[in-house]
């Protein structure tokens, strides 16, 4: 247990630690936990193997104590040095009778007690007697004095930790509002993306149309150039033919002159 305590401290000052979890660390007694933990408000010792509470330190600010699934059968008087205790879980231990629970009368602020899976719960009128013994108690084994079940584990923790249920409700409303805002923002962004895609598609079509027009103009220019070239070639051929014709006529006239001479 001592090594586990040092590990959980994580170099923090002892008098500044408010919560300590020593579950499953395996020890039959309290070892290494001292009166120096004056700020401790929550202590968990679930399934440690404790057979006695002898040596339990004086913890003036302790409000929540988890001792379930151990082998404790007596010695609850060692807990009375923590007068602010509001939540005590002793389920799964070896408590056999109500007399063993008498020391709990010292806890004037105790509102939640769990004794489930202890032989003491088999005593006749057990619940009625416990509520009478502990007037401040609101819940015993998960039910109130009218056998109404606790709403949730979080409700007990909120009450022990001093959290107001109204504040929790406000927080829930804020969360819902945030979710709505996120959904609205999500819709806007999707719409913007959709519009952007449409604009890009239109731009692509316009680009293709312009490219098509440019191609047509280029084809027209090429056709015009080909036509001009053909006309020039035809003109040259015509001139060549005229030249040949004139040359032939000149030769004929030359021969005629020679003949006449």
Swiss-Prot record:
GO terms for biological process: nucleocytoplasmic transport. Signal peptide: none annotated. It is found in: Nucleus; Cytoplasm. It holds the Pfam family LRR_9. LRR repeats lie at residues 16-37, 39-60, 61-83, 84-105. Residues 145-261 are annotated as: Disordered. Residues 118-156 form the LRRCT domain. PROSITE patterns: LRR. GO terms for molecular function: histone binding. One of its GO terms (cellular component) is cytoplasm. Transmembrane segments: none annotated. Residues 238-252 have a biased composition (Basic and acidic residues). It comes from the Eukaryota. Phosphorylated on serine residues. Residues 145-185, 194-229 have a biased composition (Acidic residues). Keywords: Cytoplasm, Leucine-rich repeat, Nucleus, Phosphoprotein, Repeat. Implicated in a number of cellular processes, including proliferation, differentiation, caspase-dependent and caspase-independent apoptosis, suppression of transformation (tumor suppressor), inhibition of protein phosphatase 2A, regulation of mRNA trafficking and stability, and inhibition of acetyltransferases as part of the INHAT (inhibitor of histone acetyltransferases) complex. Belongs to the ANP32 family. This is Acidic leucine-rich nuclear phosphoprotein 32 family member A. It comes from Drosophila melanogaster (Fruit fly).
């Amino acid at each position: 247990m001592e090594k586990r305590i040092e590990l959980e401290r994580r170099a923090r000052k002892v008098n500044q630690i408010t919560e300590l979890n020593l579950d499953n660390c395996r020890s039959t007694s309290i070892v290494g936990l001292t009166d120096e933990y004056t700020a401790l408000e929550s202590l968990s010792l679930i399934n440690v193997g404790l057979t006695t509470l002898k040596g339990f330190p004086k913890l003036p600010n302790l409000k929540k104590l988890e001792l379930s699934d151990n082998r404790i059968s007596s010695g609850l008087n060692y807990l009375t040095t923590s007068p602010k205790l509001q939540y005590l879980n002793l389920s799964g231990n070896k408590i056999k009778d109500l007399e063993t629970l008498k020391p709990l009368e010292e806890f004037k602020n105790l509102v939640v007690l769990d004794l489930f899976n202890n032989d003491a719960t088999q005593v006749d009128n057990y619940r009625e007697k416990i509520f009478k013994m502990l007037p401040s108690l609101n819940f015993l084994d998960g039910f109130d004095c009218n056998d109404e079940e606790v709403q949730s584990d979080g409700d007990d923790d909120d009450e022990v930790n001093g959290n107001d249920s109204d504040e929790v409700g406000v927080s829930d409303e804020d969360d819902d509002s945030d979710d709505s805002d996120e959904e609205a923002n999500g819709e806007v962004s999707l719409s913007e993306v959709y519009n952007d895609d449409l604009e890009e598609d239109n731009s692509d079509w316009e680009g293709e149309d312009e490219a098509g027009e440019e191609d047509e103009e280029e084809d027209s220019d090429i056709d015009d150039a080909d036509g001009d070239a053909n006309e020039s070639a035809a003109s040259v051929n015509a001139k060549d033919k005229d030249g040949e014709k004139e040359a032939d006529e000149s030769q004929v006239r030359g021969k005629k002159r020679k003949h006449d001479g």
